[in-house]
């Protein structure tokens, strides 16, 4: 047991409960309040909107004092997570000058701590609730650029085609999934839903979800891979049509060729499955 800011904070060593998650978050916030290098803190994600469920993680954003960078504080906070709360590993993700350090605890809880330079700390969406201190004026959140998503979609499709044709079924599965992932992101952007990591996919209209379901590989066989690939690239072209009809028109011919040659370079033309 450790004490932070007058609170008793128990080390977590088993599958976590919602109460344990709440207690740990309160302890981390209390520690931030007495850390002179932290000027403000906010809870982000589902915790900011009180929409957590039993599987939600802890997601806290810290505003560093003026002139400080994440390297100034990260070692102390990392030590705290390992020594007091049973962290077993962590992953660093940088976004500009902001460091997101993602911890995995022995209880299987995920704890995301982000360290923001003074001048960049602030809300970029609705999932931001200030706990103490002050934040900069909110900025508009940015969705992935649709043209970039389309580009990644056809790039995965190129490699899906060659993987199927070479009989490399597991690699083909990976590539077909990549096409589908970008179709999902495009659909989420189009419907105003969170586009990262499939967060909005289950809130898409039923007909869109049905189209996405058709891109799943049912069995690891050439025929099933080819069917899923055809459906995935068809869905990609359909999403492109919603955003840039001219681009969709230019992509149709190479898309048809990808589907045709997925069975090998000498494959005969088949019935046109693309719109």
Model features per residue range: what roles?
Residues 5-6:
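Residue-identity detector for glycine
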Residues 9-36, 47-49, 55, 62-113:
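Metal-dependent nucleotidyltransferase catalytic core
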Residues 40-43:
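Hydrophobic/anchoring residues in structured secondary elements
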Residues 53-56, 124-126, 201:
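Short aromatic-enriched loop/helix-cap "lid" or pocket-rim segments at secondary-structure transitions
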Residues 115-120:
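A short, sequence-level motif marking secondary-structure junctions
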Residues 122-148:
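A short, charged helix-loop
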Residues 138-275:
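Conserved nucleotidyltransferase catalytic core and NTase-mimicking acidic/glycine-rich helix/loop elements
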């Amino acid at each position: 047991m450790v004490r932070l800011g007058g609170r008793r904070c128990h080390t977590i060593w088993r599958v976590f409960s919602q109460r344990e998650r709440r207690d740990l978050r309160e302890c981390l916030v209390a520690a931030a309040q007495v850390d002179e290098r932290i000027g403000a803190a906010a809870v982000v994600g589902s915790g900011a909107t009180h929409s957590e469920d039993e599987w939600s993680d802890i997601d806290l954003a810290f505003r560093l004092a003026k002139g400080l960078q994440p390297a100034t504080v990260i070692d102390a906070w990392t030590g705290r997570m390992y020594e007091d709360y049973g962290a077993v590993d962590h992953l660093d993700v940088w976004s500009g000058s902001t460091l997101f350090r993602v911890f995995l605890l022995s209880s299987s809880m995920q704890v995301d701590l982000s360290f923001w330079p003074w001048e960049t700390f602030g809300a970029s969406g609705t999932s931001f609730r200030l706990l103490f201190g002050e934040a900069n004026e909110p900025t508009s959140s940015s969705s992935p650029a649709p043209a970039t998503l389309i580009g990644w979609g056809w790039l995965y499709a190129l490699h899906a085609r060659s993987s199927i044709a070479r009989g490399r079924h597991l690699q083909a599965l990976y590539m077909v999934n990549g096409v589908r992932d970008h179709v999902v992101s495009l659909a989420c952007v189009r419907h105003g839903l969170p586009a990262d990591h499939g967060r909005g996919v289950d809130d898409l209209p039923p007909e869109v979800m049905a189209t996405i379901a058709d891109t799943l590989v049912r069995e690891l066989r050439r025929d099933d891979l080819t069917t899923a690939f055809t459906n995935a690239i068809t869905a990609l072209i359909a999403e492109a049509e919603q955003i840039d009809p001219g681009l969709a028109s230019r992509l149709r011919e190479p898309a048809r060729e990808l589907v045709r040659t997925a069975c090998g370079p000498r494959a005969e033309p088949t019935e046109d499955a693309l719109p």
